[in-house]
Amino acid sequence: MILRFSFFHILLLVSAAFAQTVSDTVSFVNFENREVGVYGNDEAKEDFKRNTTDKSWWYAMDKNNGENSKIVYDGEAHGNVLQLKYPKGCVGPNDNDTPACAAQIIQPLVKTADTMWSAYDIFFEEGFEFQLGGKLPGLCGGKCYTGNAMPETGDGWSARIMWRKGGNAVQLIYFMGQKSEYGDDFKWDLGGKNPQAQFTIGKWHRIVNKVSMNTVKTPGAGDKNGRVQAWLDGELVLDVDTLRLRDYDTLHVDKFYLSTFHGGSSAEWAPTHDNFIRFDNFTVSTDSIAVTLDNGGEVGLGKNLRRENRRSVSKPIEIYRVNGSRVGRGLHSESKTLPLKNGRLVKVVQ
């Protein structure tokens, strides 16, 4: 197999290498170190590094004899990416009576925190069937409750993402006090203020999540102020801040859960033919993460936008707040011009 490189890829590799030296970057995987071909457990263990003390790690990238997980070349904009297969008839993550969908990784993070960001790029290939819904990666902590296991003692939580029927995007959160035994859906519509956000087939999307743990004034009775936020292509689509994620302040954001499959568990969730999703630029950080603009530009948020990643060009394009919400185009009296590594200027305001 041949690795393809261009000047753009060299810049990506340099920026990735720099990003991994920054203390607030917990994990970064962009697959430029991999050849086109099968991407199995051995490769995943090297890329999605885990801490050495948490025994809950799980790599399941060899589903269906290695047919579900591959590295493919996606052109100069993304280079090598992870392509996951959702076989015809697959439901859920396991090899039972149907083929197992896609792949799974539970990554105990090398660093934990009470506030953590995660991000990745996602591309639903042509012909993808949303059916009734399916799971996408997200952050979790403690026992990382999923399935029909409800948190009852404040010792775990999860905040994965789902696509629903028609491509509607939601956050599936397991937390103390949830209404459904299968976790509660929080629509990506900013609490009803915005139209329901949707995934579009044949388009690269950028997903950014931020999870902030709730406070615990009394051990065993956590406060209802945990917060989960989400941005889709630079737009804030979710901001819920009434969650009881933990009952003890020893529980943190400590895992990234690359969990993706159709389901649900019954046949009506299953695709009628082989489906594919592409992923790129998996990032976990204790500081805010870049979001991708609709025009293809990139804006860095927080400390991750550093002098070493900048170069100057002629004029600004967008204005963003540090938390990721967009102010608009043009100038802003309280904004600061920040040149980015891709040769664009943005304005970022506090």
Model region roles, listed by residue range:
Residues 1-5, 350:
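Positively charged n-region of N-terminal signal peptides that target proteins for export
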Residues 11-19:
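Hydrophobic h-region of N-terminal signal peptides that target proteins for export
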Residues 20-297:
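Low-complexity, Ser/Thr/Pro/Gly-rich disordered linker/stalk regions
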Residues 291-326:
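Residue-level detector of functionally pivotal "anchor" positions at catalytic/ligand-binding pockets or at interdomain
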Residues 328-333:
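Glycine-centered tight-turn motifs at strand-turn-strand junctions
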Residues 336-350:
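C-terminal tail/sorting-segment detector
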